[in-house]
Design a protein with these regions (language model features):
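Compositionally biased terminal segments of proteins
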Residues: 1-182
Length: 182
């Protein structure tokens, strides 16, 4: 979709291959009216529109949840990654968005993705990406949220393609945060 990037867990899983992800989140600046996006998605198969506002379109397309979000109020901090004809958000942008997501809801999948990002970047770099993307958001709150796993504990583990356990990932993230605070 022109003007959009695939973001979130699916985009990261396509780049790192660490877990299964079953939804599609497209963020960007719409180049066409929302009605044209619906028509384009309908051409791919049967869709059901679940939510539609000026900025958000949420549908189920052939059993797959697809979100199309007008993200024009935020800047991209890195160039997109092209993968098999798809325009993906870069790991740097995804890192910033994942920290923001953990700050808001703390899902298990988001923590798993942060664990994977920490295999490629330092915690300081992840936090720098977050601050660059969301300069008016609370750095301290973001840092605290990285060790608040309570909401994620009751959630199912996604199908994983790496050997680390949930407890190992939590411990790894916690140790990185403790080390950062020293």
């Amino acid at each position: 979709m022109q003007g959009f990037r695939l973001v979130g867990g699916t985009a990261l899983a396509l780049q790192y291959g660490h877990r299964q992800s079953v939804d599609l989140d497209f963020f960007g600046t719409p180049a066409v009216p929302q009605e044209d996006i619906i028509d384009m998605l309908s051409s791919l198969g049967s869709i059901v529109v679940h939510n539609r506002t000026d900025k958000i379109l949420q549908v189920v397309l052939r059993g797959i949840k697809v979100d199309v979000i007008d993200y024009s109020r935020y800047s991209w901090i890195d160039n997109p990654v092209m993968e098999e004809g798809l325009t993906l958000a870069s790991p740097k942008d995804i890192a910033a968005m994942k920290i923001n997501a953990v700050e808001g809801r703390g899902s298990r999948k988001d923590f798993i993705d942060i664990y994977m990002l920490l295999q490629h970047y330092t915690l300081g770099e992840l936090l720098d990406f977050y601050q660059k993307k969301y300069p008016n958001y609370s750095f301290f709150r973001a840092l605290l949220s990285l060790t608040y796993f309570d909401d994620a504990e009751s959630q199912a583990m996604p199908k994983m393609f790496i050997s680390q356990t949930w407890d190992e990932m939590k411990s790894y993230i916690s140790n990185k945060v403790k080390g950062y605070n020293r």
